[in-house]
Amino acid sequence: MSLDIAQIALHQLIKRDEQTLDMVLRDSLLPTNAAVEDMMAELHRVYSAKSKAYGLFNEQSELADALRACRKGDEDFLSFSRAATGRLRDELAKYPFAEGGIVLFCQYRYLAVEYLLISVLNSCNSMRVNEQLDISTTHYLDINHADIIARIDLTEWETNPESTRYLTFLKGRVGRKVSDFFMDFLAASEGLDTKAQNRGLLKAVDEYCDEAQLDKNERQNYRQQVHSYCTEQLQSGEEIELASLSQELPPLGEKTFQQFSADQGYELEESFPADRGTLRQLTKFAGSGGGISLNFDALLLGERIFWDPATDTLTIKGTPPNLRDQLQRRTSGGKQ
C-alpha cells in the first residue's frame, strides 16, 4: 500500500543547558524524495504497530485553531509547523526531563485517509564502515524507539468533529510525564478508552453465556470463538465490529450477541480497536506478584489447576517437565 506525502517539515530542539532549549527552524519544506518516503513509510509502520491511546482537541486548543487555519489556506504548512514547534518548545521547557530532538510534521494520505503526524525523534550516533573499510561516525533517527508521536486523522476530524478518536498518541515508555507534556502541547484530552471497551466486551460475553446457562466447556468454546475473531481483526489491522462479531457467533436463546449487548447497556461502540492484553483474558489466566508469575490456559482451571477461595490457595496437578526437572535437581541437592 502506498503512502502519499503531501507536505513534510523538520525542525530541531537543542538542549543547551538545564534552563535553555533552543530551536533550529527550517526555512523551507523538506523535499519529498525516496529517502523521505522510506523514512515516513517506516515511521507509519512503527506507529501503526504500537498500542495507542485516543483523544480529542479541547475547545481552546491553539494547535487545533492553527491547524484549521492551515487547512483553510489562511496559513501555509511551513508557518504552521514553525509556530507549533515554538509552542512545543515552550511546553517542553516546563519539565525537568526535557530533551531535544528532531520535530517532524508530516501531512500524508494512506488508504484514502488523510493524516497529520507530529513526532519528536531522537538523533543517535552510530558507526559505519565505508568501502575502504574505514570506520566513521554517522547519525540516524531512532524511529524504532520513537515514543513521542501523535497522529490526527484529518478526514475523521473534519467529517465527524464530535468524534472522540480522531487523535491518537503514544503514552511513552518512560512514564506518564512524557505524554502529559505532549497532550498539553496538543491541548487535547483522552477520548475513547480502548481498554474499557475491551473489558466491556469480555463482561458482555460472560453474562451472555451466564444467561444461556452454558456449562464450562460450552462457555470456554464460546470465549474461544470471540478470541479468534478479535485476534484476526487485530492481526489484519481492523477494529472489532460488534455486528460482524455477532454474525460469527451462534445465537444463545432468542437474542443475538449484539442485541443482548445493546439491551444490557454495556455502552460498547459499534466498532473499537482490539486490546491484545485484555483479550488474552478470554483464553488464559495470568498474574504476577510477590515473586510469583503464573500463566495458564483457562481450560485447565478445575481440571489440573484448582483454586480454593477460602484459603486463597492454588493447587497445580502435573507440573511442566522443565519446571519439574529444576525442582528435582534443586531438592536433590544440585546447585543450579
From Swiss-Prot:
Alphabetical UniProt keywords: Cytoplasm
Location of the region described as Disordered in the Swiss-Prot/TrEMBL record: 317-336
MF GO annotations: double-stranded DNA binding; single-stranded RNA binding
Subcellular location: Cytoplasm, Nucleoid
Gene Ontology CC: bacterial nucleoid; cytoplasm
Family per similarity comment: Belongs to the YejK family.
HAMAP family per UniProt: NdpA
Protein name: Nucleoid-associated protein ECA2747
Organism of this sequence: Pectobacterium atrosepticum (strain SCRI 1043 / ATCC BAA-672)
